[in-house]
């Protein structure tokens, strides 16, 4: 009985395992050939990707077309508006049209030529000075006209823009401004010629010169715009170039007349600065010596990195030479006096009866 029960249990377990294997085989699909599997995979991927790629490929191109159309419409509308606004005849105070040289042309040609002329004149206004004579004629007697003209830049020469947490942005006055104006006003006609706009510079000049030493003020619109720089053309000042000195911290500012300028280093806001005092001594020396043409003097300092330092060195050297000459002259005078007294003692003059 025990042996038969063991055999029966083994047969039952074998039948169970066989049924499981049969079910597994029936559930597993039969193997396909490699070519057939690849074809089916490509079809499936095509079906899966087809509907997704179509919107992605057509969407950006459609958006680009719409953007181009809008840009074209805006550009055309802007061009038409500009031609319409700036292409009309100018009008007088009563609203009547002022005739010009384009009245005989067709209407469209009139509009285009007037628009072109407007922008050409505007560009010329930016590049060229506002007038060929920026200053009025020199004063005549009985009024006093200083013999020389001093042209000063405002920013970097007289003022420094700085920022602090307590005050924010502000312009700081350079030490020695009052001394410079007081010493040079009788000898030089002082003109502020700055590359700043008038709206910015006018109140600054008022604060720098409360006593009215500055004769004239010129701003950015009076400069000549060249290669990205605002150039100060001395030929437009209505003054003799031989007696004009330009002081700036940029050599490009007087590039048209390089031997009329003194290039200083930009002031960094140091309160112990003494450059304006040295500048006053330098310009005062030129004026007191009655130099006929300042260019002959300034030409010697044109290649110097620091013209005022070079002037001080030459001045100290000349003072040493002058002291040495005076010492030698005093020594020779003492020797002559000693020989004269010795001669008078050895050969006394005969007394007149």
Curated annotation (Swiss-Prot):
GO terms for biological process: mitochondrial membrane organization; protein dephosphorylation; protein import into mitochondrial matrix. Residues 49-60 have a biased composition (Low complexity). Residues 87-353 are mitochondrial intermembrane. Gene3D superfamilies: HAD superfamily/HAD-like. InterPro entries: FCP1_dom, HAD-like_sf, HAD_sf, TIM50. The chain crosses the membrane at residues 66-86. Residues 143-286 form the FCP1 homology domain. Residues 45-65 are mitochondrial matrix. Keywords: Membrane, Mitochondrion, Mitochondrion inner membrane, Phosphoprotein, Protein transport, Transit peptide, Translocation, Transmembrane, Transmembrane helix, Transport. It is a single-pass membrane protein. SMART domains: CPDc. The modification Phosphoserine is found at residues 45, 341. GO terms for molecular function: protein serine/threonine phosphatase activity; protein tyrosine phosphatase activity. Residues 22-60 are annotated as: Disordered. It is found in: Mitochondrion inner membrane. Essential component of the TIM23 complex, a complex that mediates the translocation of transit peptide-containing proteins across the mitochondrial inner membrane. Has some phosphatase activity in vitro; however such activity may not be relevant in vivo. Component of the TIM23 complex at least composed of TIMM23, TIMM17 (TIMM17A or TIMM17B) and TIMM50; within this complex, directly interacts with TIMM23. The complex interacts with the TIMM44 component of the PAM complex and with DNAJC15. This is Mitochondrial import inner membrane translocase subunit TIM50. It comes from Pongo abelii.
